[in-house]
Amino acid sequence: MKLMIFTGLVLFAIVSLIEAQAENEKPCLPEYKVCTHAPGNCCSDLVCDCYGRYKSGAQIGRNCFCLQKGVIYKREN
């Protein structure tokens, strides 16, 4: 009986460890993907950059994208 309980506990620990490891290995977001609701999920060479959207001086929203680190984007006219 003790062996069955011990075996059950060991199996439970192994399954918990596997689930925790799978949780930590989420796929990262590639370049130009939206990261508004997941700012920490961009791939390691990217950063989540956010931009406010304005209409008549009032902010109407916010967009965030995974972009290259250290790159400055400028608006073209």
Curated annotation (Swiss-Prot):
Signal peptide region: 1-20
Subcellular location: Secreted
PTM description: Contains 4 disulfide bonds.
GO MF term (any one): toxin activity
One family name in Pfam for this protein: Toxin_35
Keywords linked to the UniProt accession: Disulfide bond, Secreted, Signal, Toxin
Disulfide bridge positions per record: none
The family this protein is said to belong to: Belongs to the neurotoxin 19 (CSTX) family. 08 (U8-Lctx) subfamily.
Protein name in UniProt: U8-lycotoxin-Ls1m
Organism per entry: Lycosa singoriensis (Wolf spider)
Lineage: Eukaryota, Metazoa, Ecdysozoa, Arthropoda, Chelicerata
